[in-house]
Amino acid sequence: MGTSRKGNKQYGRDITDEGNVLKVAVDGRLVAAVAPNLLEDVMDNLTAGKNVLFDLGRMVHIDSSGLGVLVRILQKTKEGGGKVILAALQPGPKIVFDITKVSRVFEIVPEVGDAKF
């Protein structure tokens, strides 16, 4: 178990290993300039059978690169027998998920506490 924090003024993330769940809190803007960093950080902590919970309550913007990273993490997690849940998706980013139809491939719950693995 452990927590790591990285970020700058426009983007930040906390990753906490909670046993069978990797909790990833994203702050700010998940865009092309930082999306590869998130992918690398999550992949470094992802093991077979581990679930991933994204707390997106403080994410204010996402672009196609950010969406692509989330989809890659979803694919890798499923390959390992785990599950990905997105929680607390805010209205602005939710529009991007809905327009691109990416919301159809993720389980999205209103709050972090609603996630069931």
Across the structure, where does each feature detected by a protein language model lie?
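STAS-typified acidic loop motif
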Residues: 4-40
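Short acidic-hydrophobic, aromatic-tinged amphipathic segments that line or gate anion-handling sites
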Residues: 107-111
